[in-house]
Amino acid sequence: MAEKVYIYDTTLRDGSQMEGVSFSLEDKIRIAEKLDDFGIHYIEGGWPYANPKDNLFFQKAKKMNFKNAKLTAFGSTRRPNKKVSEDPQVESLIKAETPVVTIFGKSWDLHVTDALKTTLEENLNMIYETVEYLKRYVDEVIFDAEHFFDGYKSNPEYALQVLEAALKGGADWVVLCDTNGGTLPHEIYEITKKVKERFKDANVGIHAHNDSETAVANSLMAVLAGARQVHGTINGIGERTGNANLCSIIPNLQLKLGFDVIPQENLKKLTELANFVAEIINMPLPRNMPYVGESAFAHKGGVHASAVLKNAKTYEHINPELVGNKRKITVSDLAGRSNLVHKLKEFGIEIDPKSPELKKLIDKIKELEKEGYHFEAAEASLELLIKRHFGLVKDYFDFDAYRVLIAKRRDDSLPTSEATVRLSVEGVEEHTASLGNGPISALDRALRKALEEFYPNLKELQLIDYKVRIINESAGTSAKVRVLIESTDGKRKWGTVGVSENVIEASWIALRDSIVYKLMKDEEEGIL
């Protein structure tokens, strides 16, 4: 039977310390529910004493029914030279009424003398007394040995005495923290092994930060050395360069090292979970993130794609479906017939690989990419291009003209933008105008306003991202630009692209494709 490794998620506390991340109370509740559903064992909800929002979260969480996770409150040891029962910070941990409390304490002698301004002996007393006191009120106490690896390298005997004080106080887990993120994997392994040799029966955990970009490797090495609890965050979010990324650690432990981590069927929810958290914090998931990124199983080169389609093991380390991701064969100027044949099948088009039509399509795509088009992030435009080539996209409207005006008067703080659009649907003409925050916003609003009377479903459409890139910078103000637009209707997301020497025209092309793609998909589903 596989050995168990317990996952301790600190997204709601350590993750919130990342620059640009701020969780609302509702965000925290939604993420906690998602983590529990996924099968996480411990969810660190926050620090009730330091943050009023965390206090509210723990009050709300009392009414939540966790089926897999133990909710955990986070805090610190008592203050120096103070009775533990009189420390309001410690009392706040008890009032949180969680089954588990995690406290951190100093394990680096430098921090004890220079940061805490107390003696090494008093620090040991603080740890022992706080753990012992909390054990009277909660089921489980986890002790985070802050800066443990730096402390061990500075004064190994004292760092071990810190763990001993926590264990004597009744700590259920002692967690070795690489707080500054500067320890390398071989050091993590050696030091964790020494800890396990010294405290054979102790439950040991690892808490790694990613400052040296080794947090995932450090976590795995600690487990190989005997640690059985791993701390981290979804997508590796956290202070400075982040925490250990649970989206890599969990599949590595379960699929590669054979540990029992979460229910196997839940592993398929990993990509969904990663995207959910990315959406909540409004930070796009990096395309190249291992296991869960959009490009994690993407194949661009023709040789690679051809081999993968014959046998996926040739260029994939796991089946992407195991983590809820999917294989992606991209079409680009590097792509060959295999890529395009596969993509056509995805779009429901069967074609002979030797067909002259396929050659024409490849040539067309390569010519467009030479002009500056880029379809890897704009699969909706690619699907429309292919289906138009085969006459499979109907004309949802006939475009006549658009005009965009930008005006600023002397007394205006900001310019105003107005767009007019003239088009017809099945012979019925429509001429509309709209204002916007900028020219593209105005054009988008005018186009949708003209079409919504005929296609009410377009009210669901939202533009969620807009990027402009100069393709040939040396041309200065005459440079060609590529516009990428990401859209959603609440059910799906898609990307479209436009290229022109005029940014308004490039945006129009991408906007038009976004709307046509939405209408085409709705018609395919019978809801237009």
From Swiss-Prot:
Domain Pyruvate carboxyltransferase intervals: 5-271
Record field: transmembrane: none
Substrates-to-products reaction catalysed: pyruvate + acetyl-CoA + H2O = (3R)-citramalate + CoA + H(+)
Single GO BP term: L-leucine biosynthetic process
Classification via InterPro entries: 2-isopropylmalate_synth_dimer, AIPM/Hcit_synth_CS, Aldolase_TIM, Citramal_synthase, LeuA/HCS_post-cat, LeuA_allosteric_dom_sf, PYR_CT
Keyword Amino-acid biosynthesis part of the UniProt annotation: yes
Enzyme class (EC, first level): transferase
Keyword Amino-acid biosynthesis: yes
SUPFAM superfamilies: 2-isopropylmalate synthase LeuA, allosteric (dimerisation) domain (SSF110921), Aldolase (SSF51569)
Keywords: Amino-acid biosynthesis, Branched-chain amino acid biosynthesis, Isoleucine biosynthesis, Transferase
EC number: 2.3.3.21
GO molecular function, one term: 2-isopropylmalate synthase activity
Pathway: Amino-acid biosynthesis; L-isoleucine biosynthesis; 2-oxobutanoate from pyruvate: step 1/3
Function (record text): Catalyzes the condensation of pyruvate and acetyl-coenzyme A to form (R)-citramalate.
Similarity section: Belongs to the alpha-IPM synthase/homocitrate synthase family.
Matches recorded under NCBIfam families: citramal_synth
Protein name (record): (R)-citramalate synthase
Record organism: Aquifex aeolicus (strain VF5)
The gene coding this protein: cimA
